[in-house]
């Protein structure tokens, strides 16, 4: 039996929608990253973008376990000497762009490289329950039903 290698022309991409309300950030990000890469498919090929298009709604209503909501710190650098900045998860989730928490969590679970940028383009995160992708007829994925630990009380 020969090793199967998927060609980019043979890729069948589906649209998947995930409601992030009440879900634990890391567990959600892990499932989304696997879907984006296509590792849930039997014809997965590492060097081909064979994953699905993923829409995450209600990203502002995600949960952290333990005391991470107050204590988790996100760092970024301005590019100037001594320009390291930090923000807590609470500050970001209550701020103007709360969807960045989910975006960063997923982004940091994907391998770097040229394919990374293409895969990340298949992720759409929205802070409310509205999204402009109804025409794609996305299939709902119930992450909460996959494992009871995926939902925080």
Curated annotation (Swiss-Prot):
GO terms for cellular component: cytosolic large ribosomal subunit. GO terms for biological process: negative regulation of translation; translation. It comes from the Bacteria. It holds the Pfam family Ribosomal_L13. Keywords: Ribonucleoprotein, Ribosomal protein. Disulfide bonds: none annotated. InterPro entries: Ribosomal_uL13, Ribosomal_uL13_bac-type, Ribosomal_uL13_sf. CDD domains: Ribosomal_L13. GO terms for molecular function: mRNA binding; structural constituent of ribosome. NCBIfam families: rplM_bact (TIGR01066). Part of the 50S ribosomal subunit. Belongs to the universal ribosomal protein uL13 family. This protein is one of the early assembly proteins of the 50S ribosomal subunit, although it is not seen to bind rRNA by itself. It is important during the early stages of 50S assembly. This is Large ribosomal subunit protein uL13. It comes from Methylobacterium sp. (strain 4-46). The lineage of its organism: Bacteria, Pseudomonadati, Pseudomonadota, Alphaproteobacteria, Hyphomicrobiales.
């Amino acid at each position: 039996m020969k090793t199967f290698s998927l060609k980019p022309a043979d890729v069948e991409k589906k649209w998947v929608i995930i409601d992030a309300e009440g879900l634990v950030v890391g567990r959600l990000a892990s499932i989304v990253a696997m879907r984006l890469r296509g590792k849930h498919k039997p014809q997965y090929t590492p060097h081909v973008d064979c994953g699905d298009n993923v829409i995450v709604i209600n990203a502002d209503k995600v949960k952290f376990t333990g005391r991470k909501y107050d204590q988790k710190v996100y760092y970024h650098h301005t590019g100037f000497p001594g320009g390291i900045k930090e923000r807590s998860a609470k500050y970001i989730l209550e701020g103007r762009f709360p969807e960045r928490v989910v975006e960063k969590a997923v982004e940091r679970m994907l391998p770097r490289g040229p394919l990374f940028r293409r895969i990340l383009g298949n992720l759409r995160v929205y802070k409310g329950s509205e999204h402009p992708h109804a025409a794609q007829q996305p299939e709902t994925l119930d992450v909460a039903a996959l494992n009871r630990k995926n939902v925080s009380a």
